[in-house]
């Protein structure tokens, strides 16, 4: 059953027009955990000088309970203003660009680039706004 879920998920990602040029890397880890990551290089270069890509899409599946545990779309600062700014539409149905740091996309497929303000919950996928830090890795507060 786990193999069927993985095949269906990979077919969905591979058939998406936004991901047609994406390189897929699949790694088998300890036990039944599978990590799949994809990246799309810039139009004019394959990656930035620091090796980061224009867009990163990560999936983490645990076939023990067959739940999608983590689905993340994140962006990095990009040269020439090629990232998506504050409160602008984002997600794989909207653009192949990621949000400018420290913003993240509020929804995987169609959201807005936002950051977590002071005093609000933050963590691994919910980044604090500039000049703020999260006091916990998974469950923290922006200070």
UniProtKB/Swiss-Prot annotation:
The keyword Disulfide bond applies. Disulfide bonds join 83-100, 90-105, 99-113, 115-129, 122-134, 128-142. It comes from the Eukaryota. Its main location: secreted. GO terms for cellular component: extracellular region. One of its GO terms (molecular function) is sodium channel regulator activity. Residues 1-18 form the signal peptide. The keyword Secreted applies. Residues 19-80 form a propeptide. Expressed in trichomes, that are stiff epidermal hairs located on the surface of petioles and leaves. Keywords: Disulfide bond, Ion channel impairing toxin, Knottin, Neurotoxin, Plant defense, Secreted, Signal, Toxin, Voltage-gated sodium channel impairing toxin. GO terms for biological process: defense response. It is found in: Secreted. Plant defense neurotoxin that causes pain and systemic symptoms in mammals via modulation of voltage-gated sodium channels (Nav). Potent modulator of human Nav1.5/SCN5A (EC(50)=55 nM), Nav1.6/SCN8A (EC(50)=0.86 nM), and Nav1.7/SCN9A (EC(50)=208 nM), where it shifts the activation threshold to more negative potentials and delays fast inactivation. Also shifts the voltage-dependence of steady-state fast inactivation of Nav1.6/SCN8A, but not that of Nav1.5/SCN5A or Nav1.7/SCN9A. On Nav1.7/SCN9A, principally acts by binding to extracellular loops of domain IV (Nav site 3). The presence of 'disulfide through disulfide knots' structurally defines this protein as a knottin. This toxin contains 2 'disulfide through disulfide knots'. Belongs to the urticatoxin-2 family. This is Beta/delta-urticatoxin-Uf2a.
